[in-house]
Amino acid sequence: MKIYEGKLIAEGKKFGIVVSRFNEFITNKLLEGALDALKRHGALNENIEIAWVPGAFEIPLIAKKMAESKRYDAVIALGAVIRGETPHFDYVANEVSKGIAKISLDTEVPVIFGVLTTDTIEQAIVRAGTKGGNKGFEAAVTAIEMANLMEEIK
């Protein structure tokens, strides 16, 4: 029996990160967490490229462009969509999650969903590096594992 498991080694791998500027006080923390995880696992600065987009809705387009370039072993999508008083939250959260999943399937490049979808700012703050850990860090660890797993299964 053959068992495949992605290793947590970022050395020699290239990563693209797409970050939403909207709710930047949150997304900056997610980015810090992602960079921390990548570097702790051996990624070099020159193997990490970051693209800033205006909002979460724009993440899938740039993530797709990065994935289609085949320059990256994985792409990490970081953003924060916080529920307001209108249905806008639902539209953005749904489209971003569907878009990111579709890119991975279409390009066979792991595109990791690190977009917070929370009901309150407080929930977002907790998930961006306080009591709830840092979801950017977790997304980067997932990217490392998936990049290695994809290489292993080829």
From Swiss-Prot:
Name a GO molecular-function annotation.
6,7-dimethyl-8-ribityllumazine synthase activity
Gene Ontology BP annotations: riboflavin biosynthetic process
Q: EC number(s)? A: 2.5.1.78
Q: Does the keyword Protein biosynthesis apply?
A: no
The residues listed in the UniProt record as binding 5-amino-6-(D-ribitylamino)uracil, with positions renumbered to this chain, are 22, 56-58, 80-82, 113
Q: What does this protein do?
A: Catalyzes the formation of 6,7-dimethyl-8-ribityllumazine by condensation of 5-amino-6-(D-ribitylamino)uracil with 3,4-dihydroxy-2-butanone 4-phosphate. This is the penultimate step in the biosynthesis of riboflavin.
The protein's name in its UniProt record: 6,7-dimethyl-8-ribityllumazine synthase
| Origin organism lineage | Bacteria, Bacillati, Bacillota, Clostridia, Thermoanaerobacterales
